[in-house]
Amino acid sequence: MDAEIIAIGSEMLTPERLDTNSLYLTAELNKLGVEVVSKCVIGDDRNRLAEQVRHSIARSAIVIITGGLGPTEDDVTREAVAMALDRKLTLNSEVLSWLEQRFAAAKRHMAEVNKRQAFVIEGAGILPNDRGTAPGQWLEESGAFAMLLPGPPHELKAMFERQCLPRLARVVPKQVIRTLFMRVAGMGESDLDQLIAPVYKKYENPATTILAAAGDIQIHLRARCRTESEGDALLAEVAGPIELLLGDRIYSRNGDSLEVVVGGLLRKLHATVCVAESATGGMLGERLTTVPGSSEYFTGGFITYNNQMKMELLGVSPEILQEHGAVSKETAEAMAIGARRRTSSTYALSITGAAGPDSADERVPVGTMYTAIADAAGTLVVHRQFLGDRQRIRTFVTQMALDLLRRRITGKTQTA
């Protein structure tokens, strides 16, 4: 079965508010085997909401509408849904009595406007709200099920778990959604899609989604099936050929970030790592230390933003800086060697470059980045030219450095 979620409230269209309810509902519906195919946010506009409800109920089996059940004039959900379905909206004496008792128990005065919350759509069932004063409603229309839920997350979650899930369990066919998340480093989104599209386009189930971030691509496979074993078989049918095509560019098959994967490899080897950073100003060290237990393998870092610090803390020679510049293969190599020498770490990573928006050296274009790794076997330096703003470039190069470390540990050929 397919579902749609409609979030109501003009405040949800501002940059200050985030619709977290839809994330929760999507996770819960997926557990039932229900696929959420559409989400939208609509302001406090009765006509727009009514139009959306008509479209959603006509095409999806489950429609969940969140918010807009309060007592004020801008709480338009009840009126809009009644309008969309051409049903009456009437004052329900039982709900009104319940509301009056709620206010009395709290020793609060019930304002006249609160009676708006006692209006019920013709044919709807009441969903009690034990955490607020906005009852929900459940109704059926043309074979579809619609739910009206309160906007406050603590009210919505309690109502959905106690009132909606039992009802849905009775009407939703038994189905399972199985997922597989692969994460890839070392290639761009368009190159990756061109390589694997001939595989995944053969299948409607599992569905394949590609999500790209700076230096990191996620491949999401979602299989809808009757049993977990059937779903796993469907996933394997698609994932197998993709894994053969991508090879060691895949660094995670369970959604783990690159810093988590690298941390696991270092722990397994009882190895350590340190960092020496210039352009990234500590971002690489921060990523490594976000992993719980990273003190087992992270020895420390040096932020050597100017040449004086590179010389004093890392022992980079003045001759290298003068002849090649701070942004160069030679400086990156010297930084990694110096950091490893001073910390006695198994591995040392270094980053130097021009992150922008301007470059300190007119000979070095913005986006020029060098990262180096040093270990007992020697050093390796990788140079890349990145596009984007300052933050994006810095994120790209930290991803490149972490992947360089992963490949060094596992003995893969560097292609990042």
From Swiss-Prot:
Protein name: CinA-like protein
SMART domains, A to Z: MoCF_biosynth (SM00852)
Domain of life: Bacteria
CDD domains: cinA
InterPro entries: CinA, CinA-like_C, CinA_C, CinA_KH, Competence-induced_CinA, MoaB/Mog-like_dom_sf, MoaB/Mog_dom
Signal sequence, start to end: none
Species of origin: Solibacter usitatus (strain Ellin6076)
One Pfam family per UniProt: CinA_KH
HAMAP family, per database record: CinA_B
